[in-house]
Structures are given as C-alpha cells and as structure tokens.
Amino acid sequence: MKSSTVTIEVSAPARYTYLDLTEELERAIKDSGVTDGAAIAFCPHTTCALLINEWEEGALEDFRNRVRHLVPEDVYYAHDDLDRRTQNLAESHERQNGHSHVKSMLLSASSHAIPISAGEAVLGRWQRLILFEMDEPKGRQVVFHVFGG
C-alpha cells in the first residue's frame, strides 16, 4: 500500500471568503502514485472549514449569508470575555472571534475522506473541495493524506 502526506499553505483574502482547493487535492493524489484508495483532506484550524460543494457564486453567497445570520458577530461570546476566559490564551493579543469558533463547530467540517479511483478524486460533477474562512485572513494549513494501491 502506498501512502503520502502533503501539507499546503493557503490564505483567504478576507473573512467569509472561499478558496477552491480541488486542484491541490488532485495534485496530491497524482504525486502520490495512488490509483485506487482514498484521500483525506484535513484543516487543523478552529475558525475555518473544508466544504465539498458546488463552486457557484450564488450558492456560495447564500451559504455565507445563512452562516452569518445563524451566528451573528455582534452578540456576547464567552470566548471573547477575557475577564472570564482562562484557557488557551495566546501570549499576544486575543482576537474577538468567538463567532468564528461557533460557526466552525456548527459546520463540523475540518476533514473529508474522498475516494480515489483510476488515479482521480471521485467527486460529483459539480463538487469542489473548498476552504471557507470565517476569521481574519491568515495563513492556513491543509493536510492531504493519500493512501491505497
């Protein structure tokens, strides 16, 4: 069995923007030499999400608007209350991003397993692997672990 792990660095230009990572996934599969197996796409961050869906501006706008409506930025988040919070504090400043963490938890989309057949990702006709940034733009890692025969 072959196995390969590739980590890429990406950065969305702004909060609530998307990056299409499908080509990076396909490159990781091709470079692995795996023809039949699976690829796991994993994002080790708590304020962005990996989605598999259609890359269509209207659908992406609708999703962004629904997420922002479900979890508004302008309400109290205990995560942002530094008089109360005692865990996982950075040594530098703490961002007011409780809303981003709640959105990420609701989506529960830090990883996806994608089948591989004939050396290609098995995705539906319109499906793309998409990173959705819900916090400030910054460098993000996405890990592709490809395995199989």
Task: Put a short name on every predicted segment.
Residues 1-149:
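Active-site histidine-anchored catalytic micro-motif
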